[in-house]
Design a protein with these regions (language model features):
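A post-motif C-terminal structural segment
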Residues: 22-222
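Mobile, glycine-rich extracellular loop/lid and propeptide segments
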Residues: 1-6, 11-23
Length: 222
């Protein structure tokens, strides 16, 4: 869809709360036999129609004798930046914002980057003409795969805030805006309780994601 829209004169942006070369986001700009071919996937950005890409940094597993990824992308006219904030405008031209970390919503601080911010900045940059923004809430799936129900609930709420940013634009341009919300395959099984013993309130006591909890435990083991 990104290529089709670009061929029809639309500016195209892709924003994600996970890795720029992770499968969900990469499926909109790359073709590969294996999702683990991170360098070859990311290098395809040089020929992609994307005007803007925002998300967590590439894995940068450089293959032997292959050119540094930043060099490849800069040669294609992309400007590389490492942060996105509410108070700063996105640079002109084609931009790739590769952030060091985009935390789970449960782990986020007030200043942490998030999908809603990315949608807002994409709208600001692309709204001068016809545009398409693809927003990927991949951390919902990651939380499900981790069997982390509290994190999944928080990520779903965070995704709702991102949709709200799109809806704000729709409210100002109702005749020119289409918002489509879709899901990929279900990931992971979630359990709230057994035999009717369901207590959603228990999830309010969880303060961090399982990923952050595991990292803390591993630090104590060293």
């Amino acid at each position: 869809i990104t290529s089709i829209m670009a061929q029809n004169g639309y500016a195209v942006g892709l924003v994600t709360d996970a890795g720029l070369d992770a499968a969900a986001a990469a499926s909109f700009y790359a073709h590969s036999e294996k999702r683990q071919n991170y360098y070859d996937i990311a290098a395809q950005l040089k020929d992609s129609p994307l005007s803007l890409l925002i998300g967590q940094d590439f894995k940068r597993r450089k293959a032997f004798q292959k050119e540094d990824l930043d060099v490849v992308l800069k040669k294609s006219g992309r400007r590389m930046v490492s942060r996105v904030t509410a108070g700063e405008k996105m640079p002109s031209g084609k931009v790739i914002a590769a952030l060091k970390n985009v935390p789970f919503a449960l782990d986020a601080k007030a200043e942490s980057p998030n999908l809603a911010l990315f949608v807002e900045k994409a709208v600001e940059k692309l709204q001068g003409g016809d545009f398409l923004i693809v927003a990927v809430g991949e951390k919902i799936g990651l939380a499900a795969e981790n069997r982390d129900t509290a994190a999944l609930i928080a990520e779903t709420a965070a995704f709702d805030l991102a949709v709200k940013k799109a809806f704000d634009f729709y409210a100002a341009h109702p005749q020119d805006t289409l918002i489509v919300v879709a899901s990929t395959a279900e990931a992971g099984g979630l359990v709230l309780g057994t035999d009717g013993a369901v207590s959603p309130a228990v999830f309010k006591t969880q303060k961090v994601s399982i990923d952050t909890f595991k990292s803390a435990i591993n630090r104590f083991r060293r």
